[in-house]
Structures are given as structure tokens and as C-alpha cells.
Swiss-Prot record:
<comment type="function">
    <text>The RuvA-RuvB-RuvC complex processes Holliday junction (HJ) DNA during genetic recombination and DNA repair. Endonuclease that resolves HJ intermediates. Cleaves cruciform DNA by making single-stranded nicks across the HJ at symmetrical positions within the homologous arms, yielding a 5'-phosphate and a 3'-hydroxyl group; requires a central core of homology in the junction. The consensus cleavage sequence is 5'-(A/T)TT(C/G)-3'. Cleavage occurs on the 3'-side of the TT dinucleotide at the point of strand exchange.</text>
</comment>
<dbReference type="GO" id="GO:0006310">
    <property type="term" value="P:DNA recombination"/>
</dbReference>
<keyword id="KW-0378">Hydrolase</keyword>
<feature type="active site">
    <location>
        <position position="67"/>
    </location>
</feature>
<keyword id="KW-0227">DNA damage</keyword>
<feature type="active site">
    <location>
        <position position="139"/>
    </location>
</feature>
<keyword id="KW-0460">Magnesium</keyword>
<dbReference type="GO" id="GO:0048476">
    <property type="term" value="C:Holliday junction resolvase complex"/>
</dbReference>
<protein>
    <recommendedName>
        <fullName>Crossover junction endodeoxyribonuclease RuvC</fullName>
        <ecNumber>3.1.21.10</ecNumber>
    </recommendedName>
</protein>
<feature type="active site">
    <location>
        <position position="8"/>
    </location>
</feature>
<keyword id="KW-0540">Nuclease</keyword>
<keyword id="KW-0479">Metal-binding</keyword>
<dbReference type="GO" id="GO:0000287">
    <property type="term" value="F:magnesium ion binding"/>
</dbReference>
<keyword id="KW-0963">Cytoplasm</keyword>
<keyword id="KW-0238">DNA-binding</keyword>
<comment type="subunit">
    <text>Homodimer which binds Holliday junction (HJ) DNA. The HJ becomes 2-fold symmetrical on binding to RuvC with unstacked arms; it has a different conformation from HJ DNA in complex with RuvA. In the full resolvosome a probable DNA-RuvA(4)-RuvB(12)-RuvC(2) complex forms which resolves the HJ.</text>
</comment>
<dbReference type="InterPro" id="IPR002176">
    <property type="entry name" value="X-over_junc_endoDNase_RuvC"/>
</dbReference>
Length: 173
């Protein structure tokens, strides 16, 4: 059993999602958004850090999964996103939680089946996979999708160690 905290970083809205993995079974524990209303960046970053620490304290995750930086058209936005990611990762590392990073296209491919999926498709699939009664908020759905992706890859890593697998010519058979 493992508890995974997924983070969709942002300098104004940071989504989070927490799920429990028991073998192949995933269960929803919580999700939401850390909203920063303060205009100056240092205080926004402090709010993100404090918010993530609060979530870590509440759920005690075993793993921290976060979206990788993508190249934005606006350099200023990309820098702010990188800083938000940095404080989020710092919160996890300071609590000795292992950090895993996943590209946005990889998350969409894993959860929806296509790396070009729309946000509404991600929300729908997260709702379906976790058996939720309603679609989660967009940023929270993205964070839950990141956590689901981590579970998928973590499960595959566990299977690679399975002695029943035969490795031949560079392929799993």
C-alpha cells in the first residue's frame, strides 16, 4: 500500500490530489487547490510551500509526483512556474518524501490514452478511474492524473522485478 500526492504546480493555482494504491486498486483520499491571492511572488511561493506542507502533514504520503516543466511561450510565466515547482519539491524533500516527475503528455497518454487530450477528457477519466461522483476541479484533476500516472509506472516497475517475466532480445515477453 502506498499513498501518493500528485501536484499540478502553478504560481496562482496549484492543484493537489491524494490517492492510495493497493496493488492495482486506486482509491481517492482527497484533492483541491492552493490558491494564492497575494500579488508579490515571494509571498505566493510561501503560501504554496505552506499549503503543501499542510497536505503532507494531513495525508503522510509515501511518494510525491509532480508535473515537469514545459516550455511556455511566455518566459516570465515559465520562470514563475519553475519557482512554484521548486518550492513544492522543496516541501517534499524537506519531509524526506521521494519525488517523481512526469511530462504533461505522458500523464495524458497514461490516463486518457492520448498525449493530446483536453482538460475535460482528463477530468472525465480521473472521475471514472477513481469512481468519483463528480468531476474534480481542473487543476485538482490534473494533480490526481499525475498521481495515477505515478501508480501506473510504479506498478510497471514492480512487475519488471517479477521473476515470471522473461527478457529476450530487449523485449518483455
Amino acid at each position: 500500500m502506498a499513498i501518493i500526492l500528485g501536484i499540478d504546480p502553478g504560481s496562482r493555482v496549484t492543484g493537489y490530489g491524494v490517492i492510495r494504491q493497493q496493488g492495482r486498486h486506486l482509491s481517492y483520499l482527497g484533492s483541491g487547490c492552493i490558491r494564492t491571492k497575494v500579488d508579490d511572488l515571494p509571498n505566493r511561493l510561501q503560501r504554496i510551500y505552506a499549503g503543501i506542507l499542510e497536505i503532507i502533514t494531513q495525508f503522510q504520503p509515501d511518494a510525491f509526483a509532480i508535473e515537469q516543466v514545459f516550455m511556455a511561450k511566455n518566459a516570465d510565466s515559465a520562470l514563475k512556474l519553475g519557482q512554484a515547482r521548486g518550492v513544492a519539491i522543496l516541501a517534499a524533500v524537506n519531509q524526506s518524501i521521494p519525488v517523481f516527475e512526469y511530462a504533461a503528455r505522458q500523464v495524458k497518454q497514461t490516463v486518457v490514452g492520448t498525449g493530446a487530450a483536453e482538460k475535460s477528457q482528463v477530468q472525465h477519466m480521473v472521475r471514472s478511474v477513481l469512481k468519483l461522483s463528480a468531476n474534480p476541479q481542473s487543476d485538482a484533476a490534473d494533480a490526481l492524473a499525475i498521481a495515477i500516472t505515478h501508480c501506473h509506472f510504479n506498478q510497471n516497475l514492480l512487475r519488471v522485478g517479477d521473476p515470471r517475466l522473461i527478457l529476450a532480445r530487449g523485449r518483455l515477453r
